[in-house]
């Protein structure tokens, strides 16, 4: 299929149908040549990153919106506008290929309209680009409800967060300590002419100067290295697992944190729990590549009686389901798929899982509550409420008035993440 047509289909699936980019994009990639996968990804990610700007330009250039069965052609126009405004593709190729996309989408009669819209944008680009950032939606390219949360929670930092969310994320690696230490792997990258830098705190983390195909990484197939953001790798620092312990990684998919524990310590057993059977397959695949063993269980964290093996855990990593507002730079569709009411519903779910997991923790054991969110309701307020109702919970490493650690997007080039460490008093 024509790459621009495939991109329009992805935008339609995400924006109009509410499907996630991580579902829609791989499906679309199956319809195009492998060599075009990166181009498709760049167009889809970029168009979703700057969606309100593209929408406002399209609105200016069209007499009436395309509706119903023609909506996919509206998204094809956005694909064309993104290429012309944000990519280095020659204008004639961007326009020509986008117009041809209408043919691939079985809308040959709309080719003239699409061509005219894109040509008019070329003629009036400067004025239209200025117009597209003249309102808050276009200037910050965040939904108003999320912008308000950020402004209220981070009065000094919200613009930094917005900017980080709108930039491309770097590629972080986690070196498998069972094979090499970080300095050794750094040398392997150097030998392969792959530029990289270290992280000051995440002891196995390496940041690549430019993203690359994983198969070009030394020893990827042999399990020497994995792709994982440095902020997620800090879960090991906070959990501090020890040899011989019984450890639970709750809401474990896709398994990066489970693997990190297994790479670093000889636990008696690590249990990887998740309620999503499809995503658990990723856990199994990742562990297989890394030649690691864990007990993988499909179950609801709120109902341990369905899966619990009868012995309390020494340590629990609760990577709670969340709004994922800390990883927008990796998943720009989150901005348009989430709603304000989702935060309240997620906070309730987190609270239920928190209580259920606490009951599975041994006296003297450690629970790390983690999210990849940056909303206070899911993080600081969640932990405060838990401490208020749980007398045996002792907060470690932070103050009760401001519990845990909030990492904001872009901080040492990390994703947004939250961690709070709690010990169960014996």
UniProtKB/Swiss-Prot annotation:
Q: Which Pfam families match?
A: Methyltr_RsmB-F, NusB, RsmF-B_ferredox
Give the molecular function GO annotations.
Answer: RNA binding; rRNA (cytosine-C5-)-methyltransferase activity
* Domain of life the protein comes from: Bacteria
Keywords from UniProt, A to Z, are:
Cytoplasm, Methyltransferase, Ribosome biogenesis, RNA-binding, rRNA processing, S-adenosyl-L-methionine, Transferase
Localization annotation = Cytoplasm
- Entry GO terms, CC: cytosol
Q: What does this protein do?
A: Specifically methylates the cytosine at position 967 (m5C967) of 16S rRNA.
Q: Which SUPFAM superfamilies match?
A: NusB-like, S-adenosyl-L-methionine-dependent methyltransferases
Which example biological process does GO assign this protein? regulation of DNA-templated transcription
E.C. designation(s): 2.1.1.176
Q: List, from the UniProt record, the residues annotated as the active site of this protein.
A: 372
What is catalysed by this protein?
Answer: cytidine(967) in 16S rRNA + S-adenosyl-L-methionine = 5-methylcytidine(967) in 16S rRNA + S-adenosyl-L-homocysteine + H(+)
- Keyword S-adenosyl-L-methionine, does the record have it? yes
Name this polypeptide is given? Ribosomal RNA small subunit methyltransferase B
Entry keyword annotation includes Ligase: no
Q: Which InterPro entries match?
A: MeTrfase_RsmB-F_NOP2_cat, MeTrfase_RsmB-F_NOP2_dom, NusB-like_sf, NusB_RsmB_TIM44, RCMT, rRNA_ssu_MeTfrase_B, RsmB-like_ferredoxin, RsmB-like_N
Give residues annotated as binding S-adenosyl-L-methionine.
Answer: 251-257, 274, 300, 319
Q: Which family does it belong to?
A: Belongs to the class I-like SAM-binding methyltransferase superfamily. RsmB/NOP family.
Q: Which organism is it from?
A: Vibrio vulnificus (strain CMCP6)
